Amino acid sequence: MFTGIVEEMGTVKAIRKGPHSAVVEIQAQVVLEDLHIGDSIAVNGVCLTATAFSPAGFTADVMHETLNRSALALLRPGSRVNLERALAAGGRFGGHIVAGHVDGVGTVQRITRDDNAVWYTIAAGPEILRYVVEKGSIAIDGISLTVARVEPDRFAVSVIPHTAAVTLLGRR
């Protein structure tokens, strides 16, 4: 289980795709602290299991179902990713419960800025929107956010400048 509070952005060093799965190598620092083989790490909100690690990063397997339901299939060497370690019992709980089991992928339709926020309008199909509730929690690329508006074919979230600066959302 995760909280949606991104600990760092890592970089994809390599990705080896097979016909039905992939192996991804990610350069990281913070999430390596006290890492063990078999530990869970959220990569853009997707729960992956560390299968190997070094002082420079970790490796994880990505199953066929995960490639089909998430945007991890789009990763390339050099891609930046949001990373978070699994929540430790008794640990600080700053976001919302994020299981790391992805329901689907939306598309950023519009980005607008106002004084202290960046608004993201995201198009999504009914298979995703049936789970989206105004003022409810949602994880986008693993980031804990609150839904500000819901429309028949899209929803919107508002992001503070700090969150935009330390996550992938700020690079869109």
Question: Where are the language model's segments positioned?
Answer:
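Conserved loop->alpha-helix
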Residues: 1-172
